[in-house]
Curated annotation (Swiss-Prot):
GO terms for molecular function: CoA-transferase activity; lyase activity. It comes from Rhodococcus jostii (strain RHA1). The gene is ipdA. Its EC number is 4.1.99.-. PANTHER family: KETOACID-COENZYME A TRANSFERASE (PTHR13707), SUCCINYL-COA:3-KETOACID COENZYME A TRANSFERASE SUBUNIT B-RELATED (PTHR13707:SF57). This is Cholesterol ring-cleaving hydrolase IpdA subunit.
Amino acid sequence: MVSKRDKRISLDDAVGELRSGMTIGIGGWGSRRKPMALVRALLRSDVTDLTVVTYGGPDLGLLCSAGKVTKAYYGFVSLDSAPFYDPWFAKARTAGEIAVREMDEGMVKCGLEAAAARLPFLPIRAGLGSDVRRFWGDELRTVTSPYPDASGKSETLIAMPALNLDAALVHLNLGDKHGNAAYTGVDPYFDDLYCAAAEKRFVSVERVVETEELVKTVPLQNLILNRMMVDGVVEAPNGAHFTLAGDSYGRDEKFQRHYAESAKTPQAWQQFVATYLSGSEDDYQAAVKKFAEEQA
């Protein structure tokens, strides 16, 4: 019998599989269960010129702060709590430093579904009653249904292009060494779709456990990734910080506000980078622990 592959790797090994110019999908939702440890590893790398597909939050903001992003496809970008709009994404967008493809949230899902099904596009009504088509120009087109309705009219729909990903980065709560992974809490977001739409798939988890423990700990419906959907598993405790991570921990609101405040001046941001983003993931976690103690 062939044994199942052990897919455990380090953060830097995962990012080492990425290349400049790639299109990457980042799972989670706003400031919720983002693969922040993988994002921080990406910040430490030489990878740049990225196209990012995301329901965005500080993941996209941090990558913009380091000049890593050339283009972004997103349904929204939010910190979910005050000040709500990510400061670094806002700066990059208003300064024209990145090309943006803003769209209805359902259009992102539709584009990922098309990519997962290896289809060039899928039809959708979302976007028809907005300026999305004008913003996208020739990149977004319509299609006429070949099936007339009861009145004999053929409906015009958005032909949402597949959001094909070179790589997907997601964070879940529990996983095994083979790539099976599950979330805890109330929402799967669309992490499974990101992985299904990507050529390379990397999941960070709060804990790597034995398969037997994994299937006993969570309901079957929470087990959204199976080993065929994952190429690398990274054990990263607190790896979604400062975003929330289901039942593992809530959003670090004080640190998120510190992040946003630090973006207001070059001096403050330089200090933030020196303190939190210039070392290893262990260095980051130690600095975050010190910050929490000082704020207590």
